[in-house]
UniProtKB/Swiss-Prot annotation:
The keyword Zinc-finger does not apply. Keywords: Cytoplasm. InterPro entries: Sulphur_carrier_TusA, TusA-like, TusA-like_sf. This is Sulfur carrier protein TusA. It is found in: Cytoplasm. CDD domains: SirA (cd03423). Sulfur carrier protein which probably makes part of a sulfur-relay system. The active site is at residue 20. The gene is tusA. GO terms for cellular component: cytoplasm. It comes from the Bacteria. One of its GO terms (molecular function) is sulfur carrier activity. Gene3D superfamilies: TusA-like domain (3.30.110.40).
Length: 83
């Protein structure tokens, strides 16, 4: 999903250096503040986000548009559900 790297987003969450459960807790707040249909980019370094963020999206009905891993940094693009 490297084509997502330069995609314009409506918000960015930098969770670099934070460990579970902090990235998902912060994600919950950022998604809440995002407009419906908005695109959020998440930057994380905790490997557990590879499991936690996709589950978060499924559980709360948001769309995981893309994800990318490079040199221990995990990038996610999440579209907030509409309505």
């Amino acid at each position: 999903m490297s084509e997502m790297i330069n995609t314009p987003v409506d918000g960015t969450l930098d969770a670099t250096g934070l460990n579970c459960p902090e990235p998902v807790m912060m994600l919950h707040q950022h998604i809440r503040d995002l407009v419906p249909g908005g695109l959020l980019k998440v930057i994380a370094t905790d490997p557990s986000t590879r499991r936690d963020i996709p589950k978060f999206c499924v559980f709360l009905d948001h769309e995981l548009v893309g994800q990318h891993e490079e040199a221990g940094t995990y990038l996610y693009w999440i579209r907030k559900k509409s309505g």
